[in-house]
């Protein structure tokens, strides 16, 4: 075995753990013919940690939004930075656009409905992913759920438990050859480390937990995993072209950026993004 290949096999698992980079490596199609060289190659797909999966981004405005759109954001504050570090992601918060310039979210103040303007003001970067087959009735049901639990508390206990879970779950990325193994591994760790609250007993939510429950209540679950296991980054990775830790029930579509954020602006300045 030549040295480059040996080094690659030796350091790849360590690299994946330290970088928390989830990878899917698919075997070649056994039914492909020998002349089908492209089908015979291994397909390697890396998890995208940035807010966009391609090199270029699309800037949008409020009229481009639809009820039920997911608003992913980050800020320049210490809390946002800490969440992004532990989740190895570019996002720290997720909310739902309800229409009529209203946004439903769970923050330290609890579950609340605020204006889109306020949500944008508190964010450095804000981009939108969409559930492509969401019906108007399901969007209405999401709004009804948000109004029903409005002013509920914030799930601080869930957040405290989530911090060590975000660290230990990175071990599940060490086997890039099995998507099923990764999902079973993460689910197993979640069952062992995170508390489980009965549906009727829930009195508080954190942001991604609220979003996951809202879609489930509307009859359009984003994932069948328990809502208390899901982080903003997990929802972001359920988009088309990405690699998700939990199996998505539907793949989210990138709509665009309402606010590019300081890092994307800097990337544009030096020519890294368009």
From Swiss-Prot:
It is found in: Cell inner membrane. It is a lipid-anchor. Keywords: Cell inner membrane, Cell membrane, Hydrolase, Lipoprotein, Membrane, Palmitate, Protease, Signal, Thiol protease. Coiled coil: none annotated. A lipid is attached at residue 21 (S-diacylglycerol cysteine). A lipid is attached at residue 21 (N-palmitoyl cysteine). One of its GO terms (biological process) is proteolysis. Its main location: membrane. Residues 1-20 form the signal peptide. Transmembrane segments: none annotated. The active site is at 207 (nucleophile), 257 (proton acceptor). GO terms for molecular function: cysteine-type peptidase activity. The keyword Membrane applies. One of its GO terms (cellular component) is plasma membrane. Its EC number is 3.4.-.-. It holds the Pfam family Peptidase_C92. InterPro entries: Papain-like_cys_pep_sf, Peptidase_C92. This is Probable lipoprotein peptidase YaeF. The lineage of its organism: Bacteria, Pseudomonadati, Pseudomonadota, Gammaproteobacteria, Enterobacterales. The gene is yaeF.
């Amino acid at each position: 075995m030549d040295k480059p290949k040996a080094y690659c096999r030796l350091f790849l698992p360590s690299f994946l753990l330290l970088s928390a980079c989830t990878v899917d490596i698919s075997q070649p199609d056994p039914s492909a013919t020998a002349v089908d060289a492209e089908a015979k190659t291994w397909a390697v797909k890396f998890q995208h940690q940035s807010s966009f999966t391609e090199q270029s981004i699309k800037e949008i405005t409020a009229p481009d939004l639809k009820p039920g759109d997911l608003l992913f954001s980050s800020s320049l504050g210490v809390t946002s930075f800490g969440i992004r570090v532990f989740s190895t992601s570019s996002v720290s918060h997720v909310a739902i656009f309800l229409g009529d310039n209203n946004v439903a979210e769970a923050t330290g103040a609890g579950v609340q409905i605020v204006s889109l303007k306020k949500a944008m003001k508190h964010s450095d970067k804000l981009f939108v992913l969409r559930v492509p087959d969401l019906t108007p009735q399901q969007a209405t049901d999401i709004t009804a759920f948000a109004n029903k639990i409005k002013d509920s508390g914030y799930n601080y206990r869930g957040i405290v438990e989530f911090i060590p879970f975000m660290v230990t779950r990175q071990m599940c990325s060490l086997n890039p050859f099995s998507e099923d193994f990764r999902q079973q591994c993460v689910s197993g760790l979640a069952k062992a480390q995170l508390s489980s609250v009965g549906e009727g007993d829930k009195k508080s939510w954190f942001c991604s937990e609220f979003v996951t429950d809202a879609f489930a209540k509307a009859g359009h679950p984003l994932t069948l995993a328990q809502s208390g296991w899901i982080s903003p980054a997990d929802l972001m990775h359920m988009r088309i072209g990405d690699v998700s830790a939990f199996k998505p029930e539907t793949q989210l579509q990138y709509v665009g950026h309402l606010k590019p954020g300081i890092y994307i602006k800097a990337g544009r300045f030096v020519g890294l993004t368009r």
